[in-house]
Amino acid sequence: MKDGFLKAAAFSPALRVADCTYNAQQILEQLQAAAQRGVKLAVFPEFCLTGYTCGDLFLQRTLQQGALDALEWLLAQTRTLDTVALVGLPLLVHGKLYNCAAVLCRGQLLGIVPKTYLPNYGEFYEKRQFTPGSTEVQTVTVCGQQVLFGTSLLFRCRQMPSFVLGVELCEDLWSALPPSTFHALAGATVIANLSASDETVGKAEYRRALVANQSARLLCG
């Protein structure tokens, strides 16, 4: 952070549905380029390791394990990168499947944040496969690392104490009471929202207005 500013970037890589290896390679290429440009926070889309439109393939252990293998590979490849990266993947925890954001930096998993609000209308049917996240924090083992799991996690940077990161996923922001509201009340100064929202008439403008309004009310980036 310089003069109160943090260089952040949002990415939308070209993905292949259910091809976790390819998707991880695309993410790494963009992440390495971002790190070279001084980006300290890199946000990738919801389900970027698998693609959003996997449907009932999300329930297959092959895809779930493929996403974990891709995440483990990314961790190994980013050990020297001084950039916090957020990537989306499905994660099975105690027999329940969650839509998650993994927070990683320098080869370490800093935490896993599950999605709170699952859309189940129109073209969305996430409740068919996934379980809503809880504010209760628990410890899980992911890619051989003990990591905290829960919707209420905040991440404070030791080198930049004023950088406190809160995380939510897509529909969370569209809800009546977004998790980001509670993150800001708890001290978050930056909110990252991993999204895989589709495009319909007027939606892009509405989404920008939604983000701008929430950022203004919460006094955070």
Model-predicted regions and their roles:
Residues 1-221:
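Enzyme catalytic cores with a strong preference for nitrogen-chemistry domains
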